[in-house]
């Protein structure tokens, strides 16, 4: 009996230790198709490798939050880190700047990654 109690306590301690591991998100911003000015496309922000799961992600046009942004369900990898895809339809042109802003407990403040149309 005491052995099973000890194993249960050990299991709970090891599970609670999983929450202590914090991982910084990797942020990738890209379009679904090669960009052509004036042609509709999709802007994607793939955020991966982060832990814990609480995260804020915004797609930006000229520094302002874009509307009608959708996202995938929160998923996790084999290493128990999380990943998400945020996306929205947009029409690229030469004058507008697009970016993805992410805020997570592992960051000192929000991190913004600009979309590079040449990627």
From Swiss-Prot:
Record family assignment: Belongs to the beta-2-microglobulin family.
Every Ig-like C1-type domain range: 25-114
Main location: secreted
Pfam families documented for this protein: C1-set
Name this protein carries in UniProt: Beta-2-microglobulin
Known role: Component of the class I major histocompatibility complex (MHC). Involved in the presentation of peptide antigens to the immune system.
Keywords: Disulfide bond, Immunity, Immunoglobulin domain, MHC I, Secreted, Signal
Recorded name of the encoding gene: B2M
PROSITE patterns per record: IG_LIKE, IG_MHC
Intrachain S-S bonds: 45-100
CDD domains in UniProt: IgC1_beta2m
GO molecular function: MHC class II protein complex binding; peptide antigen binding; protein homodimerization activity; structural molecule activity
Source taxon at top rank: Eukaryota
Source organism of the structure: Macaca mulatta
Gene3D superfamilies: Immunoglobulins
One annotated Gene Ontology cellular component of this protein: MHC class I peptide loading complex
